[in-house]
């Protein structure tokens, strides 16, 4: 298996970032760091210009708004990473160190080797799958105009040129060389969007899966704790478990803190995107190409939301299971002093570790709620038509 978070690290390095935790200016942002942010923000102008230019055509407006919202969400993700760049790299190093310790003979981690190894395989697979999904969606947008031009030339007919994204520039963007320049600009924006989505979203689900594995490791340690034992051994074991639990809770809260803007943006913007994309799906039922385009786009944005909801769900569930692990252990054989310490662990683990932003909680229940809303919108729009 490759290095932990390797794909996400490659995406970040492609965007000009590097692991500079030890650098004296690790908190400073240079032009290369913010160039991607400026580049993506600049794409809002031609997108909004397109909406304004076609304001009387609801189909074109909704088609463009779905891209506008995606671009806005990418701006939030880039800003989140730039603002918390050092924290991101610290968490990457922390989990890599914990993974190395799980393969060593350190007692705290040795018992959870299977959990951590399987978690890292799953995180690596999901990261690659998500990156491929985002890449294929972007590629589909890019190839659409090229395929259309190729088909027209094959049949010896003429057709109007189209940009990959619905954009309107302040110059003639449908004739050479303006068309080629705008096409290249759109491709570069798409590459940045895909790279940051793969990195930021991929890191979140990888962090969440690793946290779940370590919570499971902690549960196993508690359940397998053999009582009674000598007082020194008991204190060493208890100290190790408490420190491990505190570390996992700290990492969970840190994850929630640095991803708060992204979770908020993900829920708000996905809710808006669902409305406009469902409208496009329903109104383009007769066009197979358009239907495939918007169906893949819809699947991509729902996958992004699912990543956060699933990650939040597994962290919440496994953090609560520590309470169950203590109750399933042979705690009744422990000394009164140890029982008191175990009761404190129970109290601490009964507090839900929620990944939330405002009143939005990243959970599968909320994801299902948005899916139900999407189905209701389909029924509503079809009934109106």
From Swiss-Prot:
Residues 1-32, 84-131, 208-257, 312-357 are cytoplasmic. It comes from the Eukaryota. Odorant receptor which mediates acceptance or avoidance behavior, depending on its substrates. The odorant receptor repertoire encodes a large collection of odor stimuli that vary widely in identity, intensity, and duration. May form a complex with Orco to form odorant-sensing units, providing sensitive and prolonged odorant signaling and calcium permeability. The gene is Or82a. GO terms for cellular component: dendrite membrane; extracellular space; plasma membrane. The atypical heteromeric and topological design of the odorant receptors appears to be an insect-specific solution for odor recognition, making the OR/Orco complex an attractive target for the development of highly selective insect repellents to disrupt olfactory-mediated host-seeking behaviors of insect disease vectors. Odor-evoked OR currents are independent of known G-protein-coupled second messenger pathways. Its main location: membrane. InterPro entries: 7tm6_olfct_rcpt (IPR004117). It is a multi-pass membrane protein. The keyword Transmembrane helix applies. The keyword Transferase does not apply. Residues 54-62, 153-186, 279-290, 379-385 are extracellular. Expressed in olfactory sensory neurons in the antenna. Interacts with Orco. Complexes exist early in the endomembrane system in olfactory sensory neurons (OSNs), coupling these complexes to the conserved ciliary trafficking pathway. This is Odorant receptor 82a. It holds the Pfam family 7tm_6. One of its GO terms (biological process) is detection of chemical stimulus involved in sensory perception of smell. Belongs to the insect chemoreceptor superfamily. Heteromeric odorant receptor channel (TC 1.A.69) family. Or1a subfamily. It is found in: Cell membrane. One of its GO terms (molecular function) is ionotropic olfactory receptor activity. Keywords: Cell membrane, Membrane, Olfaction, Receptor, Sensory transduction, Transducer, Transmembrane, Transmembrane helix. The chain crosses the membrane at residues 33-53, 63-83, 132-152, 187-207, 258-278, 291-311, 358-378.
